[in-house]
């Protein structure tokens, strides 16, 4: 009896120590934050995977060849996303090219956007002057798009698009207003909820929902 009573506290103490050790070990390491100083006239290359980059200064060309990186950056003349699975938050950008897959970009405005990497997500709170999408399963969400060219199988959502040309197939486009719409691809779905749209449909099996202007 005596030896049994002495063993119980030892077992309880061992269980408590094991629990404490498990709590003390972190479940997952946090990605390091790496400050990067941009300089005018030089190309800034971000090549390390799984790193959080904090860019500062005046950026010219920024090239992201890393995978699964997080980038916070000021305005730049050109952004190239070659890696995969990156997340970029930027100030206004002039030219953007996305060739890697599964990247995400958030910015106030873009002058030229070219996307060929599959599964890209681009969110622009303001104006996109020119958007060319030739990928698959990519998404562009913007306030206003001046010229949109869809050559792959992607999706575009905007409040206003002035000129939209769809040469690819299986695209999904949702616009509040659209001035001109030209389709030569097949099986595209386009919805325009307000205003009048000049339409030319030379494709096959396209689903178009173009609602007339509301009378006052």
Predicted regions and their residues:
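Secretory targeting and sorting signals
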Residues: 1-30
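Extended beta-solenoid/beta-helix repeat architectures
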Residues: 22-23, 28-216
């Amino acid at each position: 009896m005596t030896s049994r009573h002495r063993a119980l506290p030892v077992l309880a103490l061992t269980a408590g120590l094991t629990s404490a050790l498990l709590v003390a070990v972190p479940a997952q390491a946090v990605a390091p934050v790496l400050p990067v100083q941009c300089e005018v006239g030089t190309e800034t290359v971000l090549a390390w995977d799984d790193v959080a980059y904090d860019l500062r200064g005046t950026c010219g060309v920024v090239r992201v060849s890393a995978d699964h990186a997080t980038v916070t950056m000021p305005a730049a003349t050109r952004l190239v996303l070659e890696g995969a699975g990156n997340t970029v938050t930027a100030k206004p950008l002039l030219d953007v090219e996305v060739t890697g897959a599964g990247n995400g970009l958030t910015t106030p405005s873009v002058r030229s956007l070219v996307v060929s990497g599959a599964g890209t997500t681009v969110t622009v709170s303001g104006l996109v002057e020119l958007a060319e999408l030739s990928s698959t399963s990519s998404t562009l969400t913007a306030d206003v798009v001046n010229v949109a060219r869809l050559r792959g199988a992607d999706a575009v959502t905007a409040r206003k698009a002035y000129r939209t040309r769809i040469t690819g197939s299986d695209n999904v486009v949702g616009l509040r207003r659209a001035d001109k719409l030209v389709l030569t691809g097949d099986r595209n779905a386009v919805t325009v909820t307000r205003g009048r749209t000049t339409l030319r449909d030379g494709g096959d099996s396209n689903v178009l929902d173009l609602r007339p202007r509301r009378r006052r």
